[in-house]
Amino acid sequence: MLIDPLTVVAQIINFLILVALLRRFLYTPITQVMKKRERLIAQQLQDAAHQQEVAQQEAERWRQMQQSLEHRQASFLTQAQDAADEHRHQLLQQIRDEVDSTQAQWREAVKREQHVFLSALQQRAGQQLAATLRCILQDLASANLEQQILETFITRLSHLPFSEQGVLETSLSNARGEELVISSTFPMPEDRKAQILAVLHQYAPAMESSVYQFVTIPDLICGIELKIPGYKLAWTIEQYLEQLEVKLNQVWDGMEKSWVEQG
C-alpha cells in the first residue's frame, strides 16, 4: 500500500488543528473550570478552616468563660460559706457572752442574797444567844455570885498594871469637884463599899469619899463598873457576852465566806 505524503501531511495538519481546536475550545475551558473549581474548593477549604479556627477560638473562649464562671461561682460559694461560718461563730460567741453575763449576774445576785441572809442570820443568832445567856445569868444571880463579883473587882482594882495605875491616878486628880460613879447590878453591902473606897484612897489620898456615888443598874448583868472622866474599870458578864458575840460574828463571817466561795 502506497502512502501519500500529502495525505500524511494533511492528516498531521488536521490532527494538529484538531488538537489546537480541542485545546482551545475544550481542554483550556475545562482546565480553567477545573482550576477555578480548585481555587473555589481551596477557598472554601480555607474558609472552612478559618471558620473552624474561629469556632475553636469561640469554643475556647466559652470554655474559659465557663471555667471563669465556675471559679467565680466556687469563690462566691466559698465566700458565702466563710461569711455564714463567721456569722454563726459570732452568733455563738454572742450567745456564750450573754449566757456568761447572765450566769455572772445570777451568781452575783445569789451572793448578795446569801450575804444578806447570812448577815441577818448572824445578827439574829448572836443577839438571840446573848439575850438567852443574859436571861440565864440573871436567873442564876445569887448572893454568893454577887460577893464573888465584888471580890474579883476589888482584886483587879488593887492590882492594876503600873501603866493603868498612872491613868487612874491622873483621872482621879483631874476629876476634882465631879461625882465619880460606881455602878453595880445589885445593891452593894457597906463593907464592900468601904473596901473599894479604901483602894481608891490609895490612888488619890486627897480625894474625899463623898465624891464617890454608888448606884444600882440592873442592865449591867452581874457586874460592877467604876467610871471616871477619862477612865473606866469594869467587870461584868456583859463584857464576856459581847466578846462571845464578836467571836460568833467572826465564825459567821468565815462560814459566809466559805459558802460564797463554794457557790
Curated annotation (Swiss-Prot):
Keywords: ATP synthesis, CF(0), Hydrogen ion transport, Ion transport, Membrane, Plasmid, Thylakoid, Transmembrane, Transmembrane helix, Transport. It is a single-pass membrane protein. GO terms for molecular function: proton-transporting ATP synthase activity, rotational mechanism; proton-transporting ATPase activity, rotational mechanism. Pfam families: ATP-synt_B. It is found in: Cellular thylakoid membrane. It comes from the Bacteria. The chain crosses the membrane at residues 2-22. GO terms for cellular component: plasma membrane-derived thylakoid membrane; proton-transporting ATP synthase complex. InterPro entries: Alt_ATP_synth_F0_bsu, ATP_synth_b/b'su_bac/chlpt, ATP_synthase_B_chain. The keyword Transferase does not apply. Belongs to the ATPase B chain family. F-type ATPases have 2 components, F(1) - the catalytic core - and F(0) - the membrane proton channel. F(1) has five subunits: alpha(3), beta(3), gamma(1), delta(1), epsilon(1). F(0) has four main subunits: a(1), b(1), b'(1) and c(10-14). The alpha and beta chains form an alternating ring which encloses part of the gamma chain. F(1) is attached to F(0) by a central stalk formed by the gamma and epsilon chains, while a peripheral stalk is formed by the delta, b and b' chains. F(1)F(0) ATP synthase produces ATP from ADP in the presence of a proton or sodium gradient. F-type ATPases consist of two structural domains, F(1) containing the extramembraneous catalytic core and F(0) containing the membrane proton channel, linked together by a central stalk and a peripheral stalk. During catalysis, ATP synthesis in the catalytic domain of F(1) is coupled via a rotary mechanism of the central stalk subunits to proton translocation. This is ATP synthase subunit b 2. It comes from Acaryochloris marina (strain MBIC 11017). The gene is atpF3.
